């Protein structure tokens, strides 16, 4: 079975994580300390998790304890350092809610709304 490490935040992160966990083995989760739904999900499903700022090696000191095929980032609050990106056995990717670079950042749909657009392209 394909093994994954998931970096996610907020409701979008939780919804995506819940769906992914039905099909794949989640070895670890990185999230922020305010994503209570993700923390509860990890706790209830016995998935090891790290909360807080992963920068300066803090996240990697946790991640290096796991071997995963894929690392996926979904609406993750923090910038991801190179050591985490390179840790997967085959692929690390980010799911973003718009075409880059116009709406970069975590909430492209919000800025599209503010600008009166119907799509975050």
Which residues does each predicted region cover?
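One-carbon transfer enzymes
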Residues: 1-121
């Amino acid at each position: 079975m394909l093994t994954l490490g998931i970096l996610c935040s907020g409701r979008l992160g939780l919804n995506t994580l819940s769906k992914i966990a039905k099909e794949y083995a989640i070895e670890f989760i990185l999230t922020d300390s305010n994503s209570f739904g993700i923390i509860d999900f990890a706790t209830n499903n016995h998935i090891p998790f790290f909360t807080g700022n992963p920068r300066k090696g803090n996240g990697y000191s946790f991640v290096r304890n796991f071997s995963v095929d894929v690392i996926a980032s979904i609406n993750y609050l923090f910038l991801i350092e190179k050591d985490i990106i390179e840790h997967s056995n085959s692929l690390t990717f980010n799911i973003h809610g718009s075409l880059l670079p116009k709406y970069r950042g975590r909430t492209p749909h919000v800025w599209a709304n503010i600008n009166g657009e119907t799509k975050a392209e």
